[in-house]
A protein has these predicted regions:
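Long, low-complexity, charged/polar intrinsically disordered regions in eukaryotic proteins
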Residues: 1-14, 20
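Basic, amphipathic "hinge/linker" alpha-helix immediately C-terminal to the N-terminal HTH DNA-binding motif
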Residues: 85-106
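N-terminal helix-turn-helix DNA-binding core of bacterial DNA-binding proteins
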Residues: 19-65, 92, 123
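Short, basic amphipathic alpha-helical segments that act as recognition/interaction helices
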Residues: 50, 70, 114-117
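Catalytic cores of DNA base-excision repair glycosylases
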Residues: 64, 81-83, 89
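A short, conserved structural fragment
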Residues: 74-84
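Basic amphipathic alpha-helical segments that dock to polyanions
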Residues: 66, 70-73
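Alpha-helical linker/hinge and terminal dimerization helices associated
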Residues: 38, 76, 102-120
Length: 125
C-alpha cells in the first residue's frame, strides 16, 4: 500500500476510504461502473465467454473498448483470462470469486430497473 492510500478503522478491520482520490478501491469502482465495465461483468455472470462472444453480446462495444475494459477488470482481480495456445489464440474470460460477488448485485439492480420500466412501445404519458 502506498503512502497516499487512506484507511479508516472499522471494528477490527481497516477499510479503504473510497472518497479519497488516492484510494485503490476507487479505481475498482471506476472500472466496474465504467460505460463498458458493467456490461462485461453482467455478461460474464452467465458463464465464461471468449472475446468474440463478449463483443457480440455487448452491442455497440468496439474491440478496443472491450480490450481496455477487460484489461482493467483482469488487473482489478474481477475477471480471469485464459489463453489457449492455438492459431489464432483463443482467449476465454470468466469471473473470479470477487467478480461474482460484485456482479450479483449488478444483476439484481438491472432486474429491478427492467421490472419497473414500462413495456417498450407503451404510452409514456
Amino acid at each position: 500500500m502506498t503512502g497516499g492510500d487512506q484507511l479508516i478503522p472499522v471494528g477490527t478491520a481497516a477499510r479503504y476510504d473510497v472518497f479519497h482520490t488516492a484510494c485503490p478501491a476507487r479505481d475498482v469502482v471506476d472500472h466496474v461502473t465504467s460505460r463498458w465495465g458493467i456490461w462485461v461483468l453482467i455478461s460474464l455472470q452467465s458463464g465464461d465467454l471468449r472475446f468474440y462472444q463478449l463483443r457480440e453480446r455487448i452491442e455497440g462495444i468496439s474491440e478496443k473498448m472491450l480490450s481496455q475494459s477487460l484489461r482493467a477488470l483482469v488487473g482489478d482481480g474481477l475477471v480471469w483470462r485464459r489463453v489457449e495456445p492455438t492459431t489464432p489464440p483463443q482467449v476465454t474470460y470468466g469471473l473470479t470469486e470477487f467478480g461474482r460477488d460484485v456482479g450479483e448485485p449488478l444483476e439484481d439492480l438491472f432486474g429491478r430497473i427492467t421490472r419497473r420500466l414500462a413495456p417498450r412501445g407503451a404510452d409514456q404519458s
